UniProtKB/Swiss-Prot annotation:
Residues 245-429 are annotated as: N-acetyltransferase. Keywords: Acyltransferase, Cell shape, Cell wall biogenesis/degradation, Cytoplasm, Magnesium, Metal-binding, Multifunctional enzyme, Nucleotidyltransferase, Peptidoglycan synthesis, Repeat, Transferase. It comes from Campylobacter lari (strain RM2100 / D67 / ATCC BAA-1060). The active site is at H336. CDD domains: GT2_GlmU_N_bac. Its main location: cytoplasm. GO terms for cellular component: cytoplasm; membrane. This is Bifunctional protein GlmU.
């Protein structure tokens, strides 16, 4: 059976205390809604997101990553609530899976289990450790009789610990039947999608409870829950890579984006941050290093090194306080205190302490090319664009502003001068 997915993301998210919409708050360097969409598209080719607050901003972010997504705008003023969000929605498939836009930990397997349950109407539920403000599920022989919102629950209903996750799978035809019947005669004066349960039951449909893990379906409403969700996601990401052979030293101190890929035997030390679509192949990343959207193969990086986007390292050593950006390094040693930006450096070359590729002229970026077996002395500046051929020696303290031919020694220093007794003259001693 094909499934349509509808994601409710129109809420104001006031508890986030942010000018950005709640669903654009970042978890593991990515907007919360994108984590949900990634899972949704694993089970469906028809995904629609309901928006209202800062609609255009959210649409732009979503379409950059998932261009086939449909959108529906909710009229919050006249039709608030989860059922109000569905006004005007048309499903492309026989069954609709409805979930919230603040559930970044949901997995496609669980969503599919809920959607493909044989019942006409399924509700994902969990046993809550602390029911808090969750809607309570009234069950009879594992069939749902009704869902009661906390605001409207009596003392007996509040004692129930089986709670509504906010995820539903319902046949599109049933949805069309019951939606027009939902009223806002409750304390909040909202149109509750939970009312669809008793309305469907009145029409003779059975509503099944599908039990799920509370943690995987947690909603993120404030910065505390945002932090908790990220911690849980980080833990899951690192556990999965450890199962595949990656060694993490003090994993609680490291940050790994969900798009990072490890291949072969890799080792990651404490306080490391690896972001974006980085790929680490048979390499060691030492303490307090940051890697962004870069490829590291058969290399060691750090400690205290920074690879900015578009770096490609192979058989290379990058030491402490070395920053690279858009650098192609093959068989290179850069031990300490250097900036290597917009450059290509070939195998056997050694980059001395304090080397800088001066890549920016105030308007455009320029490239530095360094060939094989080049020895670069300490405190060297390359004024790009510049090309250094193979087997060149650059003397320490040089400012390289022209191309250097193969086998040459390049020296460019200010002429030394010693003025006798200058100290005494200056300070009149």
């Amino acid at each position: 059976m094909k499934i349509s997915v509808l994601i409710l993301a129109a809420g104001l998210g006031t508890r986030m205390k942010s000018q950005n919409p709640k669903v654009l708050q970042k978890i593991c360097s990515k907007a919360m809604i994108l984590h949900i969409l990634k899972q949704a598209y694993k089970i469906s080719d028809d995904v629609c997101v309901v928006l209202s607050h800062q609609k255009e901003k959210v649409e732009q972010v979503i379409l950059e990553h998932f261009p086939n997504t449909r959108f529906l705008e909710q009229d919050l003023q006249n039709f608030p609530g989860t059922a109000g969000a569905l006004r005007g929605y048309e499903s492309k498939h026989e069954k609709v899976l409805i979930l919230c836009g603040d559930m970044p930990l949901v997995k496609a397997d669980d969503l599919e289990k809920i959607a493909l349950n044989e019942s006409d109407f399924n509700v994902a539920v969990f046993k809550a450790k602390d029911p808090k403000s969750y809607g309570r599920i009234v069950l009879k022989e594992n069939k749902i009789q009704k869902i009661v919102e906390t605001k409207d629950a009596n003392k007996e209903e509040l004692a129930i610990n089986i709670c509504n996750s906010g995820v539903y799978a319902i046949k599109a035809q049933i949805l069309k039947e019951v939606l027009p019947l939902i009223k806002n005669d409750n304390k909040a004066k909202e149109y509750y999608l939970t009312d669809a349960v008793y309305l469907a039951k009145e029409k003779g449909y059975e509503i099944d409870a599908v039990f799920v893990n509370e943690q995987d379906f947690m909603g993120v409403n404030d910065k505390i829950e945002l932090c908790l969700a990220q911690d849980l996601m980080q833990e899951a990401i690192k556990k999965e890579w450890m199962k595949q052979g990656v060694i993490f030293h003090m994993p609680a101190t490291t940050f790994i984006s969900d798009e990072v890929e490890f291949v072969g035997e890799c080792e990651v030390y404490e306080n490391v941050r690896i972001e974006g679509k980085s790929k680490i192949i048979n390499s060691i990343i030492k303490s307090s290093s940051v890697i962004e959207d870069s490829i590291v193969e058969n290399s060691d990086v750090g400690p205290l090194a920074h690879l900015r986007p578009k770096c490609q390292l192979k058989n290379t050593h990058i030491g402490n306080f070395v920053e690279c950006k858009n650098a192609l390094l093959n068989g290179v040693k850069a031990g300490h205190l250097s900036y290597l930006g917009d450059c290509e450096i070939d195998e056997g070359s050694n980059i001395g302490c304090g080397t800088i590729t001066c890549n920016y002229d105030g308007v455009k970026k320029h490239k530095t090319k360094i060939g094989k077996n080049v020895f670069v002395g300490s405190d060297t500046q390359f004024i790009a664009p510049v090309n250094i051929e193979d087997e060149v020696i650059i003397a320490a303290g040089s400012c390289v502003n022209k191309d250097v031919k193969k086998g040459s020694l390049f020296i460019n220093r200010a002429k030394e001068e010693i003025i006798k007794d200058y100290f005494y003259t200056k300070f009149k001693k």
